[in-house]
Amino acid sequence: SLHVGSEVVINGRVLHVSEIMYGVKNDGTGLEVVSNKLAQHSAGWQTCEQACYNSTLTVWFAD
């Protein structure tokens, strides 16, 4: 599994995980938080924490 410092390759570019946020709400509030964080990082992606509708998210950022 990925952790802070893990190497990731996105579109041929090598980056390192720099921040992970757990339990992010899957709604407008969560979107605002993620949008603000994306402005500070080179890349970001999300995974659902549960296999259900409107699951909270884990959001990963890399630089």
Q: Where do the PLM segments sit?
A:
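Extracytoplasmic/periplasmic soluble domains downstream of a signal peptide or transmembrane helix
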Residues: 1-63
